[in-house]
């Protein structure tokens, strides 16, 4: 089944990006020795709890949280996606990936400490675009990883989807088994 395209104008995108920056960058400022911390784990492993631990470990650092899944709610066609009962993840993917990349770029360019929350599924991209550049700009880089078995990731993803369907109407995250398998392999390559 083909996913409907929920296109938006460049002006609408820029307005959404500015709102994301306002909501997530807040008072964070450029630092002489900024930190990049990856909060990594397979899908539904519980990695979203890692930023709280990181901030506790670094109470004097003002981190920007970069989490592609959080940016989905800023999509300019969110109401239409909901009204159409469309696949939330597929319908917002291109948008949230673009926001994520621009937030990474913004933090790197401005030497702002940030936590990148994700599966580290595509390590090659992270290494070339983020890690190498962050090192060159003086970022201290760390990884906080939460590893679970592939089976646990699949069960947790299904439970999360069911809970989100119940509580978030059409804004649930459905994660395919093939994506979990791909993320598990990428995570092992990246962290293992």
What are these regions (language model features)?
Residues 1-29:
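N-terminal pre-Walker A segment at the start of P-loop NTPase domains
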Residues 26-34, 107-108:
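Phosphate-binding P-loop
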Residues 42-43:
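The conserved Walker
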Residues 47:
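Conserved lysine of the Walker
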Residues 50:
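Hydrophobic positions on the alpha1 helix immediately C-terminal to the Walker A/P-loop
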Residues 57, 155-192:
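Conserved GTP-binding G-domain of TRAFAC-class P-loop NTPases and closely related GTPase folds
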Residues 60-131:
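Conserved nucleotide-sensing/catalytic segment adjacent to the nucleotide-binding pocket
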Residues 135-157:
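Conserved phosphate-donor/acceptor-positioning beta-strand/loop module used by diverse small-molecule
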């Amino acid at each position: 089944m083909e996913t409907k395209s929920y296109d938006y104008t460049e002006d609408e995108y820029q307005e959404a990006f500015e709102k994301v920056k306002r909501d997530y960058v807040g008072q964070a400022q450029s630092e002489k020795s900024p930190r990049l911390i990856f909060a990594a784990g397979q899908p539904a492993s519980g990695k979203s709890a890692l930023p709280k631990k990181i901030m506790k470990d670094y109470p004097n650092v003002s981190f920007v949280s970069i989490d592609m899944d959080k940016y989905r709610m800023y999509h300019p066609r969110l109401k239409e996606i909901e009204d159409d009962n469309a696949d939330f993840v597929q319908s917002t993917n291109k948008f949230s990936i673009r926001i994520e990349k621009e937030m990474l770029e913004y933090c790197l360019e401005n030497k702002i400490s940030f936590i990148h929350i994700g599966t580290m599924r595509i390590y090659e991209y992270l290494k070339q675009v983020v890690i190498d550049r962050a090192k060159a700009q003086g970022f201290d880089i760390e990884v906080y990883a939460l590893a679970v078995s592939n089976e646990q990731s699949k069960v947790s993803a299904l439970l999360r989807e069911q809970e989100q369907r119940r509580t978030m109407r059409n804004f649930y995250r459905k994660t395919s088994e093939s994506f979990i398998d791909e993320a598990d392999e990428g995570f092992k390559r990246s962290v293992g």
